[in-house]
């Protein structure tokens, strides 16, 4: 019963690999020297973007807890392939505006941000790519504006068509029995998760990135549930060393971003889950009909746990899905953990393969 509820929750909420020992078997060629930065106004906020290249527009939407930098291995490769690649700091993150009110982070606002971004860039069409929460935004943007987004690539979080019936996801999740709490329920009360995470930002980011990755031992890999008394970070002991895909410089960059922005804006995305559900009735049975691609890690907590049902039903919700790929040995941060493989899949899809 609990497992079935969890599989349903993800749909409602989001309207080679690593060898043993953590050794990388692929080495990304990442050169950010040609990446430019600027601010654009979209949907009433000032958005900070990283961009490179010229040609058809590709928008890369990151998730939690990330920034434009999570696409550092993809931006140069896609630009070299002949695309204008734009990776924004999403609303509430990094150098992008972070409105105070919780309702400023609802899905319609987030979709409006990327729609407005296309127009602010002077374009009429775009390919949209998203990871984690960014995959939810990308999917909803493609569903709501098929005239604007010509194709969609989703990483880690599957899109599921809205189904009839049910109840607000967080209300349902809060009633689940057992001693542990679902992390998205823990994020609901303003100020609680922020206070825990902002005590030691670098440690917080490292814990979340490591324990949802393919490097974390199976016994300690984050499942989405934890002892509320210990807190989410208290349940995740510090790893002895960084995984091969995350350097000290990478971690320092992320920590700097969240010291600047704080966690309130990003956590406010979660605080709109039930409101997104209440406002999403018009999306009943809505399918993402553009050509699409799905990529995730074989060890991703979404795929192995509460999102498995959405993954298994992808072909129903994405009738023009060209391929769905699980990369062996990898976890939730797929474009960072397996950049060479992800880049190959992106380029193959973009070339029509």
Per-segment meaning from a language model:
Residues 321-353:
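Catalytic active-site module of serine/aspartate enzymes centered on a nucleophile-bearing elbow/loop
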Residues 8-17:
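Bacterial N-terminal signal peptides
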Residues 1-4:
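Positively charged n-region of N-terminal signal peptides that target proteins for export
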Residues 43-51:
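A short loop-to-beta-strand scaffold at the N-terminal edge of the catalytic core in hydrolase folds
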Residues 51-97:
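Conserved HGGG/HGGXW glycine-rich cap/lid loop of the alpha/beta-hydrolase fold
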Residues 21-23:
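Boundary at the C-terminal end of the N-terminal hydrophobic targeting segment
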Residues 38-42:
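Short acidic-hydrophobic surface loop/beta-edge motif
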Residues 27-35, 46-47, 93-129, 133-322:
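Flexible "cap/lid" subdomain of the alpha/beta-hydrolase fold that forms the substrate-access gate
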């Amino acid at each position: 019963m609990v497992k079935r509820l969890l599989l349903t929750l993800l749909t409602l909420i989001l309207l080679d690999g690593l060898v043993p020992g953590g050794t990388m078997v692929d080495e990304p060629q990442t050169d950010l020297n040609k990446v430019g930065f600027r601010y654009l106004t979209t949907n009433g906020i000032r958005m900070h973007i990283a961009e490179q290249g010229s040609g058809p527009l590709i928008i890369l939407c990151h998730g939690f807890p990330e920034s434009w930098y999570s696409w550092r291995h993809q931006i140069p490769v896609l630009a070299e392939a002949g695309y204008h690649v734009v990776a924004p700091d999403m609303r509430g993150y990094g150098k992008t505006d972070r409105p105070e009110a919780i309702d400023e982070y609802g899905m319609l606002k987030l979709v409006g941000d990327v729609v407005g971004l296309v127009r602010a860039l002077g374009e009429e069409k775009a390919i949209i790519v998203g990871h984690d929460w960014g995959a939810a935004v990308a999917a909803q943007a493609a569903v709501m504006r098929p005239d604007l987004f010509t194709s969609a690539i989703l990483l880690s979080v599957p899109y599921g068509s809205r189904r009839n019936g049910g109840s607000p996801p967080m209300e349902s999740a809060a009633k689940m029995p057992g001693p542990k709490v679902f992390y998205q329920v823990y994020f609901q009360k303003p100020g609680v998760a922020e206070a825990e995470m902002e005590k030691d930002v670098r440690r917080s980011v490292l814990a979340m990135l490591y324990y949802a990755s393919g490097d974390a031992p199976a016994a300690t890999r984050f499942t989405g549930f934890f002892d509320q008394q210990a807190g989410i970070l208290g349940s995740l002991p510090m790893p002895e060393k960084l995984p091969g895909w995350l350097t000290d410089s990478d971690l320092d960059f992320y920590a700097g971003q969240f010291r600047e922005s704080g966690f309130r804006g990003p956590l406010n995305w979660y605080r709109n889950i039930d409101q997104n559900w209440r406002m999403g009735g018009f999306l009943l049975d809505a399918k993402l009909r553009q050509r699409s691609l799905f990529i995730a890690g074989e060890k991703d907590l979404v795929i192995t746990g509460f999102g498995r049902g959405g993954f298994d039903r992808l072909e129903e919700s994405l009738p023009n899905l060209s391929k769905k790929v699980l990369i062996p040995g990898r976890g939730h941060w797929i474009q960072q953990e397996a950049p060479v493989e992800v880049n190959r899949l992106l380029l193959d899809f973009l070339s029509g393969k």
